[in-house]
Amino acid sequence: MRILFMGTPDIAAECLKALYAAGHDICAVYTRRDKPVGRKQVLTAPPVKEVALAHGTPVFQPRTLRDGSEDENIRALAPELIVVVAYGCILPKSVLELPKYGCINLHV
């Protein structure tokens, strides 16, 4: 199944790994932007981004999805399903209606 994954923290990264292990086609990953961490404020990628890049999956990090700026990009990815795990952004109705089989959202 062609899946668009959206998530950010460690728990989401573990879910993404499970989807890869199950043989699903992850067409792209959406995650929050890299942010400064620690005393030296080192710019650090979210765990989901690291997993996706290790698998050669395209990663997108928009500030928001609510303004519709990503609708065309998501439509072009043609996901059959969107899986959301602790993403941190609200998905607008325009995105929720795109995939053939809808969206699955896991709150943690």
Regions found by a protein language model. Give the residues of each.
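One-carbon transfer enzymes
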Residues: 1-108
